[in-house]
Amino acid sequence: MVNNMTDLTAHDAAPAWQTRDHLDDPVIGELRNRFGPDAFTVQPTRTGVPVVWVKREQLLEVGDFLKKLPKPYVMLFDLHGMDERLRTHRDGLPAADFSVFYHLISIDRNRDIMLKVALSENDLHLPTFTKLFPNANWYERETWEMFGITFDGHPNLRRIMMPPTWEGHPLRKDYPARATEFDPFELTKAKQDLEMEALTFKPEEWGMKRGTDNEDFMFLNLGPNHPSAHGAFRIILQLDGEEIVDCVPDIGYHHRGAEKMGERQSWHSYIPYTDRIEYLGGCVNEMPYVLAVEKLAGITVPDRVNVIRVMLSELFRINSHLLYISTFIQDVGAMTPVFFAFTDRQKIYDLVEAITGFRMHPAWFRIGGVAHDLPRGWDRLLREFLEWMPKRLDSYEKAALRNTILKGRSVGVAAYTAKEALEWGTTGAGLRATGIDFDVRKWRPYSGYENFDFEVPTGGGVSDCYTRVMLKVEELRQSLRILQQCLDNMPEGPFKADHPLTTPPPKERTLQHIETLITHFLQVSWGPVMPANESFQMIEATKGINSYYLTSDGSTMSYRTRVRTPSFAHLQQIPSAIRGSLVSDLIVYLGSIDFVMSDVDR
């Protein structure tokens, strides 16, 4: 097991919502020693990480410097943009019509840094970051598509979420957010022919060769409608016989504009949309969003709220892992475990429905708390589940996961090292299978996870299909361990914080104070007004690290909602891990990733 967690210094113990510039972070001193004390603008935020504005001409040099430090920043966690043109609260920041941010992580330091570059509307060009971090490829494609920012030197700067004939850049502020703002859609014969022509497969457009001097390659479309694609997902395979010479994932079929929706919903009314980004995760998806909003608001929730949130999150983690393990076994060729798993998942849904009133998409977490208190009898239902589930896990292992055929199909298949995982932004079980025990619940505890006793399972140095699935089984056991502690140690107290921005606010006082009634009316009708600032929250979601990066301009709605999902990064890694393997190995690999396309496409 690798444990590189550094002890958090005293200044890290400040409230999560405190606005800080992080000038005392060692990396700021290292950057100033190398590039000069006046080379950067350091932005105070509530993100919890240093935010440094760099000049475009210095971007690659700064990125290379950070990657080669003694304790390097080895992972490009996220990269995206923002339309700054309508933003009013920008005091002290470089003039910008648009900006692009680069979020880097250092495993050795257990610290992050966010680089930002300011751009003017008449010169939207940046050098590509792909030479430093290969996973910048898809992030730059999406940023170009959404904002029109060109990354010079990018190997294949083409649309990634939208159809190839799409016009405009959807995340610009002057781009319509609702269908009613567009002209009526008409599909003429000429337009239909144009659309069909645009969908014609041309290997050169995907960076693929038609063949060698002596033979042509065969091209095969796996998906977008294929049972092993786990959603509307297409992979173009370049084959030499059954060997995969190269492949290109084609995503975007599930894209529904989740980040654009964040700009048109109030801080409160956006919560149901978070459930649908990774639709198996339920309340897990709500956690990073409400925590990020609470940082903006300066809310500290009661202990009871923290434990309730952890309990619901771990129930949904078990629910998601059960589906993953059983469908992985099904992809390899065994059917029975799927039916076993759905029996177990039904028990979880019954428990979740009893607590929240809903099954898959509860939309139950609230800014400052949860929707309502735990119902009578919740402890009995949870206790019965905890008595049932451990024996079922043992049966999964005995019946399927120790099977020699399954192991023969998955051991050593689609294997990658820790270095490769970090280069591609891999998180979750895929990264931990390489031996790095990076679990946000342990390394950067949130919602009181530091008060729970549990282990982080890791692999032995190489992440392959079998190791990934076995880690998930052990993670199930650890989640059961956490749930037992929730059952035994549920605190008493309120289920909402006593704070003016808690939403919806407590209604009891509205019958006594006219000021409270006015506040309640405004928050329920328009939504709460969050202070102008930026906040960020990452969590250990069911499939890896999920995060929300929110920008408030002092309004009832988010100015910019950036959703970073683990599945997006994991699918980009597919070609590097599967080249030289067989098509049958690809099916096993896809089953071992643990993804749903809504988590990829948002």
Curated annotation (Swiss-Prot):
HAMAP family referenced in this protein's UniProt entry, alphabetically: NDH1_NuoC, NDH1_NuoCD_1, NDH1_NuoD
Main location: membrane
Protein name as catalogued: NADH-quinone oxidoreductase subunit C/D
UniProt keyword Transport, yes or no: yes
Function: NDH-1 shuttles electrons from NADH, via FMN and iron-sulfur (Fe-S) centers, to quinones in the respiratory chain. The immediate electron acceptor for the enzyme in this species is believed to be ubiquinone. Couples the redox reaction to proton translocation (for every two electrons transferred, four hydrogen ions are translocated across the cytoplasmic membrane), and thus conserves the redox energy in a proton gradient.
Pfam families with a match to the protein in the record: Complex1_30kDa, Complex1_49kDa
Catalytic function, reaction form: a quinone + NADH + 5 H(+)(in) = a quinol + NAD(+) + 4 H(+)(out)
Membrane-topology annotation of the record: Peripheral membrane protein
Keywords recorded for this protein, A-Z: Cell inner membrane, Cell membrane, Membrane, Multifunctional enzyme, NAD, Quinone, Translocase, Transport, Ubiquinone
Subunit architecture: NDH-1 is composed of 13 different subunits. Subunits NuoB, CD, E, F, and G constitute the peripheral sector of the complex.
Source taxonomy: Bacteria, Pseudomonadati, Pseudomonadota, Gammaproteobacteria, Enterobacterales
Alphabetical list of PROSITE patterns matching this protein: COMPLEX1_30K, COMPLEX1_49K
Residue ranges, annotated region (NADH dehydrogenase I subunit C): 1-192
Enzyme Commission no: 7.1.1.-
Region (NADH dehydrogenase I subunit D): 216-602
EC class of the enzyme, as a word: translocase
Signal peptide: none
